[in-house]
């Protein structure tokens, strides 16, 4: 079942999109009037931002300080799991050269060592 917050967001977007017909905008207005234009639900984006903030705090608690190369770039610190996943994917991707796989393995080991 579609997320109610996404449905509301879609109708709001339709109202502000100059490429949407007046007929479609009227349907969007009607839907928002009947169902409310505000929602107590959160969209995936909001959940993602909260998760990023939680992850950053958790990384700091685990000892990731300014000495860590990933802490210098806050977005990388927040997404350490994505960084690790990228290295793992490169190690198992048949289109990546052997040299690239070795390099990914070295970087993954470095990341794992720094997270201890």
UniProtKB/Swiss-Prot annotation:
Biased composition annotated in UniProt, kind: Polar residues: 39-48
CC annotations in GO: cytoplasm; cytosol; nucleus
Keyword Protein biosynthesis: no
Segments of skewed composition (Basic and acidic residues): 49-64
Keyword Nucleus recorded: yes
Principal place of residence: cytoplasm
Localization annotation: Cytoplasm; Nucleus
Region of interest (Disordered), residue spans: 32-116
Keywords from the UniProt entry: Cytoplasm, Nucleus
InterPro entries per record: Conidiation-specific_6, UPF0654_domain
Family membership: Belongs to the UPF0654 (con-6) family.
Record protein name field: UPF0654 protein C869.09
Source species of the chain: Schizosaccharomyces pombe (strain 972 / ATCC 24843)
């Amino acid at each position: 079942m579609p997320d109610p917050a996404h449905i509301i967001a879609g109708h709001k977007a339709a109202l502000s999109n100059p490429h949407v017909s007046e007929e479609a905008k009227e349907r969007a207005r009607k839907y928002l009037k009947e169902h409310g234009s505000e929602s107590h639900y959160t969209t995936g984006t909001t959940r993602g931002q909260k998760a990023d903030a939680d992850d950053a705090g958790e990384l700091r608690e685990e000892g990731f300080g300014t000495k860590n190369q990933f802490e210098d770039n806050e977005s990388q610190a927040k997404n350490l799991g994505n960084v690790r996943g990228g290295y793992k994917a490169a190690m198992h991707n048949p289109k990546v050269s052997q040299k690239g796989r070795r390099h990914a393995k070295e970087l993954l080991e470095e990341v794992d060592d720094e997270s201890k």
